[in-house]
From Swiss-Prot:
Residues in compartment: Cytoplasmic: 1-9, 55-76, 135-244, 296-439
Region entry Disordered, spans: 207-231, 388-408
Mutant phenotype after disruption: Reduces zinc transport into the vacuole and hence limit the over-accumulation of zinc caused by the deletion of ZRT3.
Record-level GO BP terms: cobalt ion transport; intracellular zinc ion homeostasis; zinc ion transmembrane transport; zinc ion transport
Keyword Ubl conjugation: yes
Membrane topology label: Multi-pass membrane protein
Origin: domain of life: Eukaryota
Span(s) of short sequence motif Histidine repeat 1: 140-144
Stated name of the protein: Vacuolar zinc transporter COT1
Catalytic activity: Zn(2+)(in) = Zn(2+)(out)
Organism of origin: Saccharomyces cerevisiae (strain ATCC 204508 / S288c) (Baker's yeast)
Amino acid sequence: MKLGSKQVKIISLLLLDTVFFGIEITTGYLSHSLALIADSFHMLNDIISLVVALWAVNVAKNRNPDSTYTYGWKRAEILGALINAVFLIALCVSILIEALQRIIAPPVIENPKFVLYVGVAGLISNTVGLFLFHDNDQEHGHGHGHSHGGIFADHEMHMPSSHTHTHAHVDGIENTTPMDSTDNISEIMPNAIVDSFMNENTRLLTPENASKTPSYSTSSHTIASGGNYTEHNKRKRSLNMHGVFLHVLGDALGNIGVMLSAFFIWKTDYSWKYYTDPLVSLIITGIIFSSALPLSCKASKILLQATPSTLSGDQVEGDLLKIPGIIAIHDFHIWNLTESIFIASLHIQLDISPEQFTDLAKIVRSKLHRYGIHSATLQPEFITREVTSTERAGDSQGDHLQNDPLSLRPKTYGTGISGSTCLIDDAANCNTADCLEDH
């Protein structure tokens, strides 16, 4: 475990919070301070969250894929982030209820000076935690642009011919991919799934791989002004570590609120001064909730395998349909394995020979690479008749094919449907409704 790793940071904060929890609960009972006792249980909530985060990091790092968990435990951190977000939301609800009770019947704080001192000590503790996790929360990758003038429109099938590929950084454009992380996709998925993997810092077509490139000739496969750029706003931060950061931030804000209300109660004689404590608590609760809810939504979307928020499935599909030889795309799925690893699977209907598929698949993969998708499963479906140029130019659900046998096309998203023209649907897919009825 190297210094500065996630585990070291979490363990450091865990030890600090445990010590402070003992101090708070002891002094709270000795001084009969309900506020301190309540804050100590708030600290206990953070300790539990840190334990969950530490478990998630260790499991994700040390558990390898096996026959039961074929992707490994990489999503353990996503699960940890969701658990932490739920803890935060539950904590916000409990603070809200307590604050409303204190507004109705505000308690008298007999020793505000002592509460102020404890608040200062707690703020110092949480400031250390903020410094520990600030870098994880704000870390962003650098920009790296990939663009292909003409969107492969000038590619023609020639076997063999030369193929050139130029990468460049473009001023003013931050076109990044989400794979600049310590995760190695080849360690997560078996070689049968991932033939090879290039991260964004690696030239897609390196000299040693040049002989393996698609034999498609091109006149405009270079970076050019006016090319089609796809922006990916990459964030390297881990949702799990972001959840820990929000816990620490919530504690720090809570301690600031305790200090402000204690100081106000200590130094003023207003009859309404005791209302400051619950009112400040409500404001802080709103801030914490506004951060915890998006965290839970992000983690939930990943677990539900939604399309990554930085991508448009329709845009990716439209880009792929411009590749000569592709007629239609269906059963198209894009999802996150983790925050930084995108995966795709799709069926593509083709009007090329099976011998040409490998070369076309490499073009498809390079397209997906530009969008940050570095692992894709392609299911080819070869059309056995000649396809007209009008059909080739159409989209995956073109209306101009209504009188053609291919007009009954399956939907781009979802799975194959009964009666569709998915050429391998009957062989590869079950009719889900019928199967469930049989069982």
